[in-house]
Each structure stands twice: as structure tokens, then as C-alpha cells.
């Protein structure tokens, strides 16, 4: 499994919105701080909005629009973001209607998929941002 760049962007976008805590954060602000294209930011925010991760706020001028979290980063799991951004299914290329469905290869892929989902569901977005022995997600290695 190879995680797409846009999925990593999604995690960093959530970090920026979370840092805004008591206010909406604009896509322009996120783009400037992260160095990503505004179009890419909006595309990712749209996907996360459609899936209940962020909320879009309309507005102009002083009461400008932007984005806020729909739920806490303590509740948003890696699995949820990866599923939203790209899906998680190791066995996706095996056709369930064919003879592969009953092979050891297929059954092994199903089990691997279940274990991967279990692992990804154990980590939250907050886990990325907390400092530990190796630093936080945003620290340079």
C-alpha cells in the first residue's frame, strides 16, 4: 500500500484547522502556511467536508468564510482519513466473483486487509501531532 501525497496533505490541513481552534481557517491561510496550491487544498477540503470531517462556513469581509473541524482530531482515525482520501482494500484487485474468491491468496488478502484496518483505526490524527521520542509529525527528521 502506498499512501498518496494528497492524503498526507489532508493530515496537515487538519492540523492547521485544529490550530485555529476558536475560529474558521481559510483555505488561503492553509495554502500559505503549508506551501500547497490553493486548488489542491480546496479539493481535499471538499472531500473531507462531504465526509463529515470539516465544515465549510460561508462569509465575506470581516466575517469571512473558512473551515472548522466537524469533530475533534482525537476522534478522527488514520483509517477514516485514508478511507476517505483513497480507500483501504488490499484485496480490491481480486475479483470476488471469480475462482480467486476461494483461494488462499484471496483469503490471506482479506485477513491482511482486516488487520491493516484494525491497526489504522488505533491511531488518531492527534497522535500525529503529539511529541514523542521521535518528535511530532511536523518536526523535521
What is each residue range found by the language model?
Residues 18-22, 71-72:
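Short helix-capping/hinge SLiMs at alpha-helix to coil transitions
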Residues 72-95:
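Conserved segment of winged-helix/HTH DNA-binding domains
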Residues 51-52:
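Glycine-centered, phosphate/nucleic-acid-interacting loop/turn motifs that mediate DNA/RNA or nucleotide
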Residues 39:
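Key DNA-contact positions within bacterial/archaeal DNA-binding proteins
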Residues 95-141:
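C-terminal regulatory/oligomerization modules of transcriptional regulators
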Residues 14, 45-46:
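Short, hydrophobic-biased segments on the C-terminal half of alpha helices
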Residues 6, 57-67, 71-74:
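Short, Lys/Arg-rich nucleic-acid/phosphate-binding segment
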Residues 25-35:
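A short alpha-helical element within helix-turn-helix/winged-helix DNA-binding domains
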